[in-house]
Amino acid sequence: FQPNAALPYEFNGGCYASPLTEDFPVMYYRTDIFEELGLTPPKTWEEFYEVVSVLQHNNMTAGVPNMQEDDTTGMSVYTAMYAILLSQMGGSYMKDDLTATYFDSPEGVEAFKMWTGFYSMYGLPYQFDFFNRFRTGEMPLGFAAYTIYNKLAMSAPEIKGMWEMLPIPGLENSDGSIRNQTVSGGMAMLMLKNTENPEQAWDFMDWFSGDEAQVSYGLAIESLLGAAGRYNPANRNAFLRLPWSVKQQQNLLEQWDKCVYLPQVPGGYFIDRNLTNAFRQVVIMNKNPRETLLDYNKEINQEISRKRKEFHLD
């Protein structure tokens, strides 16, 4: 597994699940349309804005996901987008002791301004079906989970060979390197506390999450379903043995190595809810980004504090 892959399942010194699958956002672009317009895929956000300008002048647009949720991972894509920008700016999602969010930090505020600015300043759509718009060419650039590859490979044969997936854009350092972290989510295995056969259950979990079982499972699914069944194991060794092309594998590994994992805390359900509320207030109601984020951040942290008291964690 990746070094911090179990972080979402850890709390207060305990680990409550074992990673099974993993998914993270990458950048998709239509190579045919980019070639026609003389564009190159953006590596930084400045380049992204330049590409968006050209696309919009040609009655096209780009897709930055907002209020959607990926059913296969349960990962909230809008939370992911904010967390991506926050990580790239060097900020933290939570304080070190996990007692409060860090959205009121300078990096947190700047990331929120940038996130909402995609829609309020650059006019990008905040509700869209990326698969269909990407297929038709209306949205030849966008960010989505790498498992969307399965759907594109199976259900969009008319654009086969006309698209690629790359790491997402980032912020450029003074030395020319790019900070393009993304966030990862996935599914996990767990054992119930009152299981009758804990040793046998653990043996199964240990076996099924191992290299050979994960490779066999992934290849078996793909042999039945074709590319639509391409498996996304959290086991890195198993991933390396699945039938990705060399270029696809290199691009995915480059992004995977820069994945950030978000901790889960009691009251964490208030994070998604209030980030969404703050987003709507700014993008739809034209409220001030900084003041709006700080107001909703207080509500988030009040709920986290309330749940910590309820569970006697303080």
Task: Locate predicted features.
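Glycine-centered hinge/linker elements that transmit conformational signals in sensory
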Residues: 51-54, 96-126, 168-171
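Paired acidic/hydrophobic, glycine-rich loop segments that form the ligand-binding mouth/hinge
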Residues: 140-145, 164
